[in-house]
Amino acid sequence: RLAESAACLVRDASDPGPQLRRLLEAAGQKLPESRPWLELNPAHPLVARLNLLPDGATFDSLAALLADQAQIAEGGVPPDPAGFVRRLNEWLLGRH
């Protein structure tokens, strides 16, 4: 599951994915809170770079970017879409 991706969200087998969750909630169903965990691909260059960074703002920015990318890859929306765009732009422009 992490052949090419830097990270992915892993859910319990009984936990519906984000699309089914939205569909069920739109139908009025109450669902327990989803608690996926972030799985990192240690062979991916971004994760290797994260591993070399000291704690601080740059580390936090890349870690948040990887978590948001994992959320998007599974069809979800990052908790702070504007923050995701800002962080992505900073990395693309080399201003992280």
Kindly give the residue locations of the regions a language model identified.
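Long, intrinsically disordered, charge-dense linkers/tails
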Residues: R1-H96
